Amino acid sequence: MTILTQSTTWQALAAHSHQIPHMRELFAGDPARFSNMSLSTCGLFLDYSKNRATPETLNLLQTLAQEAKLDAKIKAMFAGDIINTTEKRAVLHTALRSTAEQSIVAEGQDIVPEVQQTLNKMQQFVTSVTSGQWKGFTGKAITDIVSIGIGGSFLGPKIVSQALRPYWITGLNCHFVANVDGTSISEKLKLLDPETTLFIMSSKSFGTQETLTNTLTAKAWFLAKGGSQSDVAKHFVAVTSNVAKATDFGIDADNIFPMWDWVGGRYSLWSAIGLPIALLIGMDNFRSLLKGAHQMDTHFANAPLAENMPVIMGLFSLWYGNFFNAQSHVVLTYDHYLRGLPAYFQQLDMESNGKSVTLNGTHVDYSTGPVIWGGEGTNGQHAYHQLLHQGTALIPADFIMPLQSHNPIGEHHDQLASNCFGQTQALMQGRTLDEALAELSKSSLSDEEKLLIAKHKVMPGNKPSNTLLMDKLTPETLGALIALYEHRTFVQGAIWDINSFDQWGVELGKSLGNDVLARIGAEQDATALDASSNGLINLYRQGKI
């Protein structure tokens, strides 16, 4: 057993998990449960009353966090300590949304001035492009942006841009390319005019396979459509640490934005990786996005555990994963603009906490990161919600909804809200056999048929959920929401004693993929790998089954 599972508190939680009454009873016995188990901060309201929890549960979970030295680990992250131990790096995405007055030290120097300098450079660039001052090779202004990246340099900018569609004020169009499948970039290029298109290449090394391949394809298209090598600088910019490779490609050194080792890809949208966002919503709105995240950082760093929103959410996720065998967690966004958030949180959580050894290399004897999935309400109600209500797996849920719509048409938002709240009630309350029989009492079915149908209509309830509300979706509230989930992810990893900031599973896939690519291009049949891989490579080379 590990130190964590040997602890008295862990054992107490394991025993306590079998003693919690049904949530129906918890609500019936405590009229103040909603007010006692809800919290408001940073423009967000969290109702966590529909969880399998009593005051004793919360006390035990907070004790577990204290024993794991969560407070000290939070301070270590914000202080710039080397908490990404396998890569010997600080973890300071929080510095990207710091204020100019702060001082944050990494590797012996204050990094805030460089962060502010980069924001100012972004400001100048955005102004130049959106004002029409930036001209393409034929003297025309830019109309379309193509953001080329992968992972965090793709998903963050895409999802945030999508979420903030009501704040697109610059008149530009933005297209996102990530997949190395040639169809992806080909379909985008069909829509574009090389004279008015600007490409943003985002890769720390300027060598990420998918990103470089797509960028080279974009460059070939640009040159084939009338541009010259000397014109590349007018249509390509980069976010990278490898200035030499970017300039060799043809990008002007003045149009290269920095990336830092102390920012992981899945936490990078707050940096110059967010250029596509800023080009769509303007720098004032981009700074509001940063402001909302900074407010959540401040809350996370200073609020006591019992009143700390990321801590509460992280502890409940751990509670269900480790003591109720919950293998997945569903995120349900009741706002069309937020439909991409489940995919973003999926990457954030699963890439961070999909680990199986502790910081000292001991194999864990408890579950770590769950499968994160989800979708858009109310669509999911006509699909996978069936499994949530009557399936055999326990799947905790997060419901996210703004109280006010950007498009208040008729009763649309009232119906959306009623569905959201109704789903949380149904998951908690369920339907008993007696209630199902009562609903069938006036039917013409025989008593035997009524009993049979009633059994099929029973729902156990007691299915946990959180509800997150905001007044309205704005750059500021979105920033706070994303930072909330970042810190929630950190809380779990800190208690599990794993490194939430490396991704060696991703790295292995990259290296093996490169090896297979070399074998695909070889003259002789593949024979050096396992029989399955050899067979697949040879079939691919034949081009037919």
From Swiss-Prot:
InterPro entries: G6P_Isomerase, G6P_Isomerase_C, Phosphoglucose_isomerase_CS, SIS_dom_sf, SIS_PGI_1, SIS_PGI_2. The active site is at E351 (proton donor), H382, K510. GO terms for cellular component: cytosol. Its EC number is 5.3.1.9. It comes from the Bacteria. Gene3D superfamilies: 1.10.1390.10, Glucose-6-phosphate isomerase like protein, domain 1. It is an enzyme of class 5 (isomerase). It holds the Pfam family PGI. Pathway: Carbohydrate biosynthesis; gluconeogenesis; Carbohydrate degradation; glycolysis; D-glyceraldehyde 3-phosphate and glycerone phosphate from D-glucose: step 2/4. It is found in: Cytoplasm. One of its GO terms (molecular function) is glucose-6-phosphate isomerase activity. It catalyses: alpha-D-glucose 6-phosphate = beta-D-fructose 6-phosphate. GO terms for biological process: gluconeogenesis; glucose 6-phosphate metabolic process; glycolytic process. PROSITE patterns: P_GLUCOSE_ISOMERASE_1, P_GLUCOSE_ISOMERASE_2, P_GLUCOSE_ISOMERASE_3. Keywords: Cytoplasm, Gluconeogenesis, Glycolysis, Isomerase. Catalyzes the reversible isomerization of glucose-6-phosphate to fructose-6-phosphate. Belongs to the GPI family. NCBIfam families: PRK00179.1 (NF001211). This is Glucose-6-phosphate isomerase. It comes from Shewanella sp. (strain MR-4). The gene is pgi.
